[in-house]
């Protein structure tokens, strides 16, 4: 009777290698390691999507803070930019807000001018 020792050992080694660095028994025992590796794959999949949401939230927070320093709310700024037909994404706006205040102020002034009309 063959028990597939080579195949089983290879499978277990692969899982334990993936579990390297995990805390406690999760990197030593096959069953707990396998469970943790499965969870890790789930967390990685979930958080790749979460990261996009988190960055968008961060950009909006930064844009809002800079917009308020220029006398506008976030929504007013975005609406004004849309009316002015200035297409700049939130990532770039947030970068300008942090690294180039003068350029952000120019965009905010353009948005204000369109909102005033």
Curated annotation (Swiss-Prot):
HAMAP family: Ribosomal_bL20
Protein name: Large ribosomal subunit protein bL20
Role noted for this protein: Binds directly to 23S ribosomal RNA and is necessary for the in vitro assembly process of the 50S ribosomal subunit. It is not involved in the protein synthesizing functions of that subunit.
InterPro entries from the UniProt entry: Ribosomal_bL20, RIBOSOMAL_L20_CS, Ribosomal_protein_bL20_C
Alphabetical GO biological process terms: ribosomal large subunit assembly; translation
The family this protein is said to belong to: Belongs to the bacterial ribosomal protein bL20 family.
Stored Pfam families: Ribosomal_L20
Gene Ontology molecular functions: rRNA binding; structural constituent of ribosome
GO cellular component term of the entry, any: ribonucleoprotein complex
Keywords, in A-Z order: Ribonucleoprotein, Ribosomal protein, RNA-binding, rRNA-binding
